[in-house]
């Protein structure tokens, strides 16, 4: 049996980043169970300050995960990206970057869509037959 993977991304605003990437990848933000969270608080395992309201839902403040929607619906083994709150800011260059595969879509069209949602265009590049936009 193969192993599954969770990629963890440190973020100042994990819930907003999870929303953005879920929309970009056409994945879903993993639901959090407000009743379970309230239960953990009432039993003394968690405190109110460890929670927040995001888009009208009670969630854990420190993180949000995204998964392919079909994995959530089918309860498939977890492949997920977890965005977790990091108190410190970034201090050095990112050691990981994400290549968003376009599956035949026009890269300029996708660039415009991502910019409209808050991404920043940095530069375009080409190597042999491959070309891309670098964005942040």
Regions inferred by a protein language model and the residue ranges of each:
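Vicinal oxygen chelate
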Residues: 2-9, 19, 23-25, 31-32, ...
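Helix N-cap motif at beta-to-alpha junctions
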Residues: 13-14, 103-107
